[in-house]
From Swiss-Prot:
(6S)-5,6,7,8-tetrahydrofolate binds at residues 111-114. It is an enzyme of class 2 (transferase). GO terms for cellular component: cytosol. Belongs to the Fmt family. The keyword Repeat does not apply. It comes from the Bacteria. It catalyses: L-methionyl-tRNA(fMet) + (6R)-10-formyltetrahydrofolate = N-formyl-L-methionyl-tRNA(fMet) + (6S)-5,6,7,8-tetrahydrofolate + H(+). This is Methionyl-tRNA formyltransferase. GO terms for molecular function: methionyl-tRNA formyltransferase activity.
Length: 321
């Protein structure tokens, strides 16, 4: 395949896809990624996973502050690319950029468009209890994930799958569907199908507050919320005992409780017959497997309970508790 490709991408998801394209000898003439960002609690700048991969392969790299910068746009034109491939780049491309490549710009979206347009299709579909996701390749236009569909592939969403695990499954499949698309462009067999606007939905980026667990919902809905925000922005709650101020408790791993006859008010901490830490929900309960109390490391629920022996623990139902 002789098509010249400029690849736009930033996080690990995009790096996994890029690695697959390079493995199959796709002709990537340049890579565009976001500028390095400071590490949390440090001023040290951290390169994106895509940048690290591009440098290791000696691929020309661009990191514009703004994709509308005239100098950057001219640099893109100089590559005389046939196609731009965009995978989780993290910024909206202006029409002046979309018009540069000979055959247009194609985006790999980690969701089944037109549903879940936006930044968080993976997390949102799990939180909604969807059982099937997938990748959609679209020919980009000026809208947000509104372009015509070129190809679609499907990935089942397992009942215990987290957002992180679904992202890995989608990324591992992403290279294949893009290679198929590029081959169709090269052969002149590519087709495009307009999205059905009536079936569109939005998947905006999750806030940290959306990781706060709402225990007064049924356990299945709570479990979907936990899985959807794992690993980021992360599931958390507030716990208190003996009248002390509430403290944050991060939930690293959980499951639906199989215990029968769980009784308690939403947010009550209970023990199962197997001495598991359960949290009562509006219906059913959640079993906490691995947790991280504020100011401490990750631990299993037994260690947490041992550290609070004799104390009646209570989880908050809202952020004001």
């Amino acid at each position: 395949m002789s098509l010249k490709i400029v690849y736009f991408g930033t996080p690990q998801f995009a790096a996994t896809v890029l690695a697959d394209l390079l493995h199959h000898e796709v002709n990537v003439v340049a890579v565009v990624t976001r500028v390095d960002k400071p590490q949390k609690r440090s001023s040290q700048l951290i390169p994106s996973p895509v940048k690290t991969l591009a440098l290791s392969k000696n691929i020309p790299l661009l990191q514009p502050e703004k994709v509308s910068d005239p100098q950057f746009v001219e640099q893109l034109r100089d590559f005389e690319a046939d196609v731009f491939i965009v995978v989780a780049y993290g910024a909206i491309l202006k029409q002046m950029v979309l018009d540069i490549p000979k055959y247009g710009c194609y985006n790999l979206h980690a969701g089944l468009l037109p549903a879940y347009r936006g930044a968080a299709p993976i997390q949102r579909c799990i939180m909604d209890g969807v059982v099937q996701s997938g990748n959609t390749v679209i020919r980009m236009d000026a809208g947000m994930d509104t372009g015509d569909i070129a190809n679609v592939s499907f990935v089942p969403v397992g009942p215990d799958m987290t957002a992180g695990e679904l992202a890995e499954a989608l990324a591992s499949q992403g290279g294949e569907i893009l290679i198929k698309t590029l081959q169709q462009i090269s052969d002149g067999t590519i087709t495009h199908t307009p999205q059905e606007a009536s079936k569109a939905s939005i998947a905006p980026k999750l806030s940290k507050e959306e990781g706060f667990i709402l225990w007064d919902h049924p356990a299945e809905k709570v479990y979907a919320q936990i899985r959807g925000v794992t690993p980021a922005p992360g599931a958390w709650t507030l716990y208190s005992y003996q009248g002390k101020p509430a403290r944050r408790l991060v939930i690293r791993k959980a499951s639906l409780s199989s215990s029968q006859g769980v009784y308690g008010h939403p947010g009550d901490i209970l023990l199962s017959d197997q001495q598991e830490l359960l949290v009562a929900c509006a219906e059913g309960a959640i079993c906490l497997k691995e947790i991280q109390p504020e100011g401490k490391g990750v631990m299993d629920s037994k260690s947490f309970l041992n550290g609070h022996s004799g104390h009646k623990l209570k989880l908050s139902l809202n952020l004001m508790s």
